[in-house]
Amino acid sequence: MAREFSRTRRIGQQLQQELAFVLQRDMKDPRIGMVTVNDVDVSRDLSHAKVYVTFFEEDPQVIEAKLAALNTAAPYARTLVAGRMKLRVMPELRFIYDASLVEGMRMSNLVSKVIRDDEAKKGHIGDEPQEGQREED
């Protein structure tokens, strides 16, 4: 019977927490700035980990530069996290930009805009006199 949470998933969750802490407190690279660790996907043999991150930037060039800086600093981040976690093998980190949060916010804004437009149209249509009604001056 399979466990509800596999070992790789538990390690991924702990790695996510430790990376978030290390990136906020210990990494002093100004090129990285504010970064959010959304998820960590660890391979079954614990040799590699994909770290999904987002930034508070929307410019694709800035995002690419920050992602490149993170991937350059990945060995240092790996060393810092290895000191905080008790693992025999520390996965090699690979940072990947996660656009799902930004895309979700964009979709939410679109839905809100459509709802506002519909309500405005209903209000505008309701203001017009219908057949059989007269406007009073």
UniProtKB/Swiss-Prot annotation:
GO biological process, one term: maturation of SSU-rRNA
Entry keyword Cytoplasm: yes
Molecular function (Gene Ontology), one example: ribosomal small subunit binding
Record note on quaternary structure: Monomer. Binds 30S ribosomal subunits, but not 50S ribosomal subunits or 70S ribosomes.
GO CC terms, sorted: cytosol
Gene: rbfA
Entries under InterPro entries matching the protein: KH_dom-like_a/b, RbfA, RbfA_dom_sf
Record's keyword terms, sorted: Cytoplasm, Ribosome biogenesis
Signal peptide annotation: none
Role: One of several proteins that assist in the late maturation steps of the functional core of the 30S ribosomal subunit. Associates with free 30S ribosomal subunits (but not with 30S subunits that are part of 70S ribosomes or polysomes). Required for efficient processing of 16S rRNA. May interact with the 5'-terminal helix region of 16S rRNA.
Family: Belongs to the RbfA family.
UniProt name for this protein: Ribosome-binding factor A
PANTHER family reported in the protein's UniProt record: RIBOSOME-BINDING FACTOR A, CHLOROPLASTIC-RELATED (PTHR33515:SF1)
Record Pfam families: RBFA (PF02033)
The species this protein was found in: Shewanella amazonensis (strain ATCC BAA-1098 / SB2B)
Main location per the UniProt record: cytoplasm
NCBIfam families in alphabetical order: rbfA
Subcellular location: Cytoplasm
